[in-house]
Amino acid sequence: MAEGFAVNRQWIGPEEAEELLDFDIATQMNEEGPLNPGINLFRVPGITETEKQEYCNILQPKLQDLRNEIQEVKLEEGNAGKFRRARFLRYSDETILSLIHLFIGYCTYLCKRNKLGTLVHNIDIEAPQEECYSNRERGTTVNIKYSRRCCIGTTALYLLLLTGIIIYTQTTQAQVVWRLPPLVVPVEESEIIFWDCWAPEEPACQDFLGAMIYLKASTNISIQEGPTLGNWAREIWGTLFKKATRQCRRGRIWRRWNETITGPSGCANNTCYNISVIVPDYQCYLDRVDTWLQGKVNISLCLTGGKMLYNKDTKQLSYCTDPLQIPLINYTFGPNQTCMWNTSQIQDSDIPKCGWWNQIAYYNSCRWEQTDVKFHCQRTQSQPGTWLRTISSWKQKNRWEWRPDFESEKVRVSLQCNTTKNLTFAMRSSGDYGEVTGAWIEFGCHRNKSKLHSDARFRIRCRWNVGDNTSLIDTCGNDPNVSGANPVDCTMYANRMYNCSLQNGFTMKVDDLIMHFNMTKAVEMYNIAGNWSCTSDLPSTWGYMNCNCTNSSSTDSNKMACPKRQGILRNWYNPVAGLRQSLEKYQVVKQPDYLVVPREVMEYKPRRKRAAIHVMLALATVLSMAGAGTGATAIGMVTQYHQVLATHQETIEKITEALKVNNLRLVTLEHQVLVIGLKVEAIEKFLYTAFAMQELGCNQNQFFCKVPPELWQRYNMTINQTIWNHGNITLGEWYNQTKDLQQKFYEIIMDMEQNNVQGRKGLQQLQEWEDWVGWLGNIPRYLKGLLGGILGIGLGVLLLILCLPTLVDCIRNCISKVLGYTVIAMPEVEEEEIQPPMELRRNGRQCDMSEKEEE
């Protein structure tokens, strides 16, 4: 080797090549190297010097690279340790075998693992080994002994697991909760209801609610008394009033356009200039006053938030009321409405009083009378006076219009009205909280479209016989000697013309807020100049409250007596009381979110077979909501309701957006989207309920949910097991007897919503496995099989690709160890070479041969 280096230091001879290849093989046996690093060609038995020289010529580039690598890398004990990979594989096999022993229950192997040594056979010993076995050990190998222990331990482990599962299933039975049972119950008086209105072509009311008006169901169920929609009459009235006027705020731009004003000579000499025309939306005031406020619009009230209406007259369930005419301000004329005379018994201030007393005159015995009275008004205007050239402020056209200066003193304007019937008014009453004195009346008047005037409605106030002292109240009397009174005639006679005026404003009190509506500009926009006429358009079903007048027993001549036998109550109609009376027949009911199911129900066995869940559901449907008439069933109505909500894209987008904010992974939209009021409280409740239900393991298709007994017992929830009575009970009675449990179950949900300590403990004790695989319940059975097959095949192929080499090696080693053989692999040689024998030795020697003979 030294001589070769002396001659040519760049040439690598056979001796150095042999060492370099040993280094390469030792390096490849590291952890990062391949499983089979190969053999050293220079160590093949029988190789000649000529062949070594040929190998050196062929492998010279490779050998040069190895030499450079040795020179660059510092060889230390930690670098490229020989047989390190073999040791790693050995320890890996021991780890795998330990996991297998642990899985099959052979746990003692882990304890004895460190005590086991390594069996070494020295093949150079000349003296044969002697057998030394006891009678118990003779004929039994170590593999047979440990295989018996393995079988016994595995059997005991699985028997123990099976026994534990049986004991757990028999002793722990979860409480069953029925979600959304098919029944309706009255709401509590303290509950908050969410509602909205629907009216044709009214932007202030929700458009999509119109599809819900026709969702009705005939039913023969008996519902106990509860709150009606009339209980919320004042809140509904206040909201409708705000809806009617919220689009008419001062400052809103109705029309806007630019226009050029030219002089006599056109735009010469800079005589033209540009102006911007802005018209506020004052027209909205008159539209709302003449439609909404007077009750000319048919409005339906629809409940949201999962509530329904039960019509006591028609025995029907619905989501919306029938179309109602709901006046929003006090009127002399209105729909039929009851009243009370004895004011000491009136507990509600909104109920109208059936009369008026003034000094010794008592108007009582009031009754509502339908009337077809009409008012006819005629406006005339004198032509003398100046004419102004003004821009038409209500038409989006660049044109000029001549109109008389009706505000000038030279222009005579007359607005006179008459009535078709004699109207005697019994008393003075408040008129829109205004300071009106004397005899007066207000009504709405409609003007038809003509060549010079557009279609319009006006509110007209007629006042006559004001009296000498306007600071005193009107008495409708004729006696001037009455003290503290201003005698006037309160009768409006038929076919007599009275001087009237267009009402350009009114004042309303909503809750504690007094709002004044100034409609001066709105009246002017309707082109009131000129001659025109209008006729009242009171509904034919409206009437007034007519009262009888009686004198008291007092004979004081200085006090006013009855001027007339009968009189009409002016502004008698109270909108809140009228709305309450119209809504009294609609009882507010709801579908419960859940119903506690007694264990006796689940364990109930009829004569032939066990009552399954679908049998219970059918029985409950028949007992509770079976339709007696030809109308649709309530279940079908709820389904249609869900379809209506599903088509309302705006609602779905808003609720979905809210769900994204709260990061919910389950959305039970079909059953929980009953909350569509788009109110903050409703959406929060929807989110909380959806969150709690998903944590309880209830998805959108799961009507029966199991609550863990630990969570159930924490709240001391006990249930009467005798209420089932073999099915002889209605769902209404069932709900009433378990009503207290519903409240306790609601506490569980609230604990989950608020994430307090008890709620978190309850969530931790839920069945995690059901939460993870709960979504599988939504997949049909055939899809489950198909999906399972695909996943199984894919997983099997993946495991086979990844684990096949290790698996084959493990199986080979296990078989060899069980049989007691040690595999000795010799390097491969060429086919023409004589292959050395590869022997399998049993316990270090061949059968019936001594060690000398083997050697």
UniProtKB/Swiss-Prot annotation:
Specific enzymatic cleavages in vivo yield mature proteins. Envelope glycoproteins are synthesized as an inactive precursor that is N-glycosylated and processed likely by host cell furin or by a furin-like protease in the Golgi to yield the mature SU and TM proteins. The cleavage site between SU and TM requires the minimal sequence [KR]-X-[KR]-R. Residues 1-784 are extracellular. Residues 642-692, 735-771 form a coiled coil. Residues 806-855 are cytoplasmic. The record marks R610, A611 as: Cleavage. This is Envelope glycoprotein gp150. One of its GO terms (molecular function) is structural molecule activity.
